[in-house]
UniProtKB/Swiss-Prot annotation:
Superkingdom classification of source: Archaea
Organism: Thermococcus onnurineus (strain NA1)
Protein name: Putative snRNP Sm-like protein
Keyword hit for Ribonucleoprotein: yes
A Pfam family it matches: LSM
Annotated CDD domains: archaeal_Sm1 (cd01731)
GO biological process, one term: mRNA splicing, via spliceosome
SUPFAM superfamilies: Sm-like ribonucleoproteins (SSF50182)
GO CC, one annotated term: Sm-like protein family complex
Length: 78
């Protein structure tokens, strides 16, 4: 049976993820919530640009219609 997208995201709960937005912005943080519209809640969120942290946000909500991709992040790997 094929994996469903929300199942993959559900397994990433309470883990670090990289969220790539349509306009090229990237955020990294711990995924603490999501819904069927892919609205994403990150804790310890950081904006990443050229592989470097440019701003720290703490807890943020990212609107789902801006999300291009969500990827698990291995600790220590960028």
């Amino acid at each position: 049976m094929a994996e469903r997208p929300l199942d993959v995201i559900h397994r990433s709960l309470d883990k670090d993820v990289l969220v790539i937005l349509k306009k090229g912005f990237e955020f990294r943080g711990k995924l603490i919530g999501y819904d069927i519209h892919l609205n994403i809640v990150l804790a310890g969120a950081e904006m990443i640009q050229d592989g470097e942290v440019v701003k720290k946000y703490g807890k943020i909500v990212i609107r789902g219609d801006n999300v291009l991709a969500i990827s698990p992040v291995d600790v220590g790997v960028e």
